Structures are given as C-alpha cells and as structure tokens.
C-alpha cells in the first residue's frame, strides 16, 4: 500500500498538513506486506509462519472518543510506518476500552456515549474488512484525527478522502457481524491480566506497559529477537 498516494487523496488541506507534522510516514512508501486474513476475534492471523514467528504483537486497547487514545494513535502510533517498526510488529487494534454490556438489556454501554459505541463498531469493522494493516490504519487514523478536531461525526468523509469503498464496512456495521466483533473484543479486554485501568492500554507481546505507553517503541525494540532491527531500534 502506497501511504503517500493514499493520503494525497484527502480533501482537507488541514488534515494533510497536520498529518505531515504529526506523522512523517506520509512521505514513506510502505513496503508491500502479505495480506492477513482475520477471523472475527481478530486473534488469528494467517501469514507465512516464518514471518509471523519473528514479529511481535503490539496490541492497543482503546475507545474511539477518548482524547488520550486519539492523540496516541495520531501523534505516536502512526510513526511506526515511518521508522520501520511496523516491519517487526503485528499491530492489533481493539476498540472497546471501558465499554460494558448492560446485563438487563444486553445493550453495549460506552463511556463516552452512544456515538462512541458506533465509532467503536465502525473501527472494529474497518479492521475486519480491510485486512491490509496499511489500509485499515490509514482509515482509523483519519477517524481519530476527526475526533481530535471535534468533527468525528464527519467520519464518512474519510472513505472518500482516502478513495476507499465504504459499503463493505457499512454492511459489517449494520449486520450481526459488527456486534459479534465488539462482543469478542469485550471478552478479550475483560481477560486482560492484569486488568486495564485506563486507555489506551498498550501490550507488547502479552506484557502491558502501563502509563509508559508513549514509550512503546523502546519496549518493542527490547523484546525483538530478530536479526534485522528497524531504524527505530538502532
């Protein structure tokens, strides 16, 4: 996926300018990656076993309308595509956070209201439908940028800005699949050990890094046992 071309389609000059400032990987043309097939729990990744065995799992547990989560994704996490860290990571985005299921109504309740529930499901479907991490991260980056700008209700514009077809993602949201994805994320988040106490909750190879989440690169580099360390680890 050519990230530079992808973001050059964005219609908002302020969005493009801020992306350049916050995330230099706009100028970086990502190397091609094998396409991974994710099942509904986003826990199984089917790729070349030799590639997967050398990669680290970087899991980010977050919620769509949380300001700290949006800032982390836009201004920090996005840098992995510029400094090469993405080449040693299986990036997993789990949009559930502090949501819970109301036991009497079985309805999902989100910390920041029903809009956040919709955006959590939107992002869960984005990851599930757009299996290429470059594509689904670019779209989620756009969603979270709009959260920072206070324009999150304009999320549909991200599809047109990036030249992506919204229909498959919307079909997921409006079907039972969207709910199933969120239910599985709820179970996964509840099984965190130790339990998460805030968001974003960042886990490197099953090791939570707590309040030092903005320094996740150092933890990833320390955990990496491969032979070809990316620029970020040198």
What would you call each of these model-derived segments?
Residues 26-28, 41:
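A compositional signature for long Ser/Thr(±Pro)-rich, low-complexity
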Residues 35-41:
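Juxtamembrane luminal stem/stalk of type II transmembrane Golgi/ER carbohydrate-processing enzymes
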Residues 41-56:
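A short beta-strand-turn-helix
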């Amino acid at each position: 996926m050519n990230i530079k071309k992808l973001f050059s389609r964005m219609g908002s000059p302020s969005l493009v300018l801020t992306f350049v400032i916050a995330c230099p990987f706009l100028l970086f043309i990502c190397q091609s990656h094998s396409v991974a097939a994710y099942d509904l729990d986003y826990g199984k990744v089917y790729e070349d076993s030799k590639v997967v065995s050398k990669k680290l799992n970087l899991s980010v547990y977050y919620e769509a309308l949380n300001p700290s989560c949006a800032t982390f994704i836009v201004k920090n996490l996005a840098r992995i595509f510029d400094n090469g860290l993405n080449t040693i990571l299986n990036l997993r985005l789990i949009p559930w956070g502090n949501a819970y299921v109301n036991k009497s109504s079985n309805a999902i309740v989100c910390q920041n209201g029903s809009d956040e529930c919709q955006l959590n499901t939107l992002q869960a479907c984005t990851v599930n439908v757009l299996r290429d991490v470059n594509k689904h991260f670019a779209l989620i980056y756009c969603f979270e940028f709009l959260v920072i700008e206070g324009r999150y209700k304009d999320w549909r514009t991200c599809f047109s800005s990036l030249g992506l077809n919204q229909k498959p993602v919307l079909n997921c949201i409006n079907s039972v699949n969207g709910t199933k994805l969120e239910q599985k994320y709820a179970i996964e988040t509840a099984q965190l050990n130790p339990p998460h106490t805030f968001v974003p909750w960042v886990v490197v190879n099953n090791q939570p890094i707590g309040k030092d989440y903005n320094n996740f690169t150092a933890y990833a580099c320390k955990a990496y046992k491969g032979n070809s360390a990316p620029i970020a680890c040198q």
